[in-house]
Swiss-Prot record:
<dbReference type="InterPro" id="IPR006195">
    <property type="entry name" value="aa-tRNA-synth_II"/>
</dbReference>
<dbReference type="GO" id="GO:0006434">
    <property type="term" value="P:seryl-tRNA aminoacylation"/>
</dbReference>
<keyword id="KW-0436">Ligase</keyword>
<keyword id="KW-0030">Aminoacyl-tRNA synthetase</keyword>
<dbReference type="InterPro" id="IPR015866">
    <property type="entry name" value="Ser-tRNA-synth_1_N"/>
</dbReference>
<feature type="binding site">
    <location>
        <begin position="266"/>
        <end position="268"/>
    </location>
    <ligand>
        <name>ATP</name>
    </ligand>
</feature>
<keyword id="KW-0963">Cytoplasm</keyword>
<dbReference type="InterPro" id="IPR010978">
    <property type="entry name" value="tRNA-bd_arm"/>
</dbReference>
<dbReference type="InterPro" id="IPR033729">
    <property type="entry name" value="SerRS_core"/>
</dbReference>
<dbReference type="Pfam" id="PF00587">
    <property type="entry name" value="tRNA-synt_2b"/>
</dbReference>
<comment type="pathway">
    <text>Aminoacyl-tRNA biosynthesis; selenocysteinyl-tRNA(Sec) biosynthesis; L-seryl-tRNA(Sec) from L-serine and tRNA(Sec): step 1/1.</text>
</comment>
<feature type="binding site">
    <location>
        <begin position="235"/>
        <end position="237"/>
    </location>
    <ligand>
        <name>L-serine</name>
    </ligand>
</feature>
<comment type="function">
    <text>Catalyzes the attachment of serine to tRNA(Ser). Is also able to aminoacylate tRNA(Sec) with serine, to form the misacylated tRNA L-seryl-tRNA(Sec), which will be further converted into selenocysteinyl-tRNA(Sec).</text>
</comment>
<dbReference type="GO" id="GO:0005524">
    <property type="term" value="F:ATP binding"/>
</dbReference>
<feature type="binding site">
    <location>
        <begin position="353"/>
        <end position="356"/>
    </location>
    <ligand>
        <name>ATP</name>
    </ligand>
</feature>
<dbReference type="Pfam" id="PF02403">
    <property type="entry name" value="Seryl_tRNA_N"/>
</dbReference>
<dbReference type="InterPro" id="IPR042103">
    <property type="entry name" value="SerRS_1_N_sf"/>
</dbReference>
Length: 428
């Protein structure tokens, strides 16, 4: 959520910056609402003051033995007018808030201006894609050949965009997640967290999935009243970031760095026809998430560090990748600046996204009322929040299967994963 004061005082600037994201702000309507809000606010305050003043005179009139019926009737009339104005004001404020909640974050000045992913800017590459001297197989053929990826039974059990993993492929998938968690907790300074996979509406509003992206979520509808309104998490960013919702954190506690390995659930609304085969785009997938909660002046440096932590995973696994900065038209709703990390997939002969690392600045914190107490003046101020995939486990499995494949269909295990695989150097 944007700063209301900045929005009111810099409406034209806000509209221009949001336009670079493809969001058209109706300045005339918002100005009209703001003028109406001011008018109703003044009228409400004046009616309140008049009623208070006349109410005080009732006691004085009674003390003088005067009839107060007329005064009481006047107070009642003012009260009715006041109630009506309050209802009008509440309606205007609700509409203003709805507009504010629908606005994406302002892009950072360092984010390149562009319309879509074709205008993202590459900032670096690591590793050299392997040259194969045999026909390359994709992860689907490799996984099925190892009897480790079972798409047929997943469709039978649930439907499309789900997977059953078995045997050494399932073990490799588990090893990938464990390696990522160990790396982030032992070397990168994150605290591991176990979080609910179901969250309430307030949590989804806080991180920005609601109200705009409800169709992307899986919502539960249990029979019990207690469970109403819960949704499966699309990312562990939601529960991890909401740990500071409605809180004031001591400055000495910052930065807060959290990581979690969870299943994630997405309806993939709007993705019809995209990546219909394989593990690239699933309704249920595992991801290791990183979240940082920091002071405002530290957030841009934290974004660089966070992105580096995700890149380190790929470097340790020996997987070639490139990092791009997203242009304004391709950034996520709540992001001010985002780096995407794309891993090399030989079977597709291209780089595909495996991590997205974003600085939300105070956008989520304002929605969540997540603050810290500044030592200098002992006053609360909004935090800055960041999040990034470290990494998407299923896509990492895809990258390992394809990049480490052998001519006979077996897969060489990356060295850093061998301790998690009981010392195995190869599967298949």
């Amino acid at each position: 959520m944007l700063d209301p004061k900045f929005l009111r005082n810099e409406l034209e600037v806000t509209a221009e910056r949001l336009a670079t994201r493809g969001f058209i702000l109706d300045i005339a309507h918002l100005t009209q609402l703001e003028e109406k809000r001011k008018s109703l606010q003044v009228a409400t305050e004046e009616l309140q003051a008049s009623r208070n003043a006349i109410s005080k005179s009732i006691g004085q009139a009674k003390a003088r033995g005067e009839d107060v019926d007329a005064i009481m009737a006047q107070v009642g009339d003012l009260g009715s007018q006041l109630d009506a104005k309050k209802i009008e004001l509440a309606a205007v404020l609700e509409e203003v808030n709805a507009i504010a909640m629908s606005m994406p974050n302002l892009p950072d000045e360092s984010a390149p201006i562009g319309a879509d992913e074709t205008e993202n800017v590459e900032v670096r590459r690591w590793g050299t894609p392997r040259t194969f001297d045999f026909p390359i197989k994709d992860h689907i053929d490799l996984g099925e050949g190892l009897n480790g990826l079972d798409f047929k039974n997943a469709v039978k059990i649930t439907g499309s965009r789900f997977i059953v993993m078995k045997g050494q492929v399932a073990r490799l998938n588990r090893a990938i997640g464990q390696f990522m968690l160990d790396l982030h907790t032992t070397e990168h300074g994150y605290t591991e967290a176990y979080v609910p996979l179901l969250v309430n509406e307030a949590s989804l509003l806080g991180t920005g999935q609601l109200p705009k992206f409800g169709e992307d979520l899986f919502h539960t509808k249990p029979a019990t009243e207690e469970g109403q309104g819960l949704s499966l998490i699309p990312t562990a960013e939601v529960p991890l970031t909401n740990l500071v919702r409605d809180s004031i954190v001591d400055e000495d506690e910052l930065p807060i760095k959290l990581t979690a390995h969870t299943a994630c659930f997405r309806s993939e609304a709007g993705s019809y026809g995209k990546d219909t085969r394989g593990l690239i785009r699933q309704h249920q997938f595992d991801k290791v998430e990183m979240v940082q909660i920091v002071k405002p002046e530290d957030s841009m440096a934290a974004l660089e560090a966070l992105t580096g932590h995700a890149e380190t995973v790929l470097q340790r696994l020996g997987l070639p990748y490139r990092t791009v900065i997203l242009c304004t038209g391709d950034m996520g709703f709540g992001s001010s600046k985002t780096y995407d990390i794309e891993v090399w997939l030989p079977a597709q002969n291209t780089y595909r996204e495996i991590s997205s690392c974003s600085n939300m600045k105070d956008f989520q914190a304002r929605r969540m009322q997540a603050r810290y107490r500044v030592k200098a003046d002992n006053k609360p101020a909004l935090l800055h929040t960041l999040n990034g995939s470290g990494l998407a486990v299923g896509r990492t499995l895809v990258a390992i299967l394809e990049n480490y494949q052998n001519a006979d269909g077996s897969i060489t295990i990356p060295e850093v994963l061998r301790p998690y695989m009981g010392g195995l150097t190869k599967i298949g």
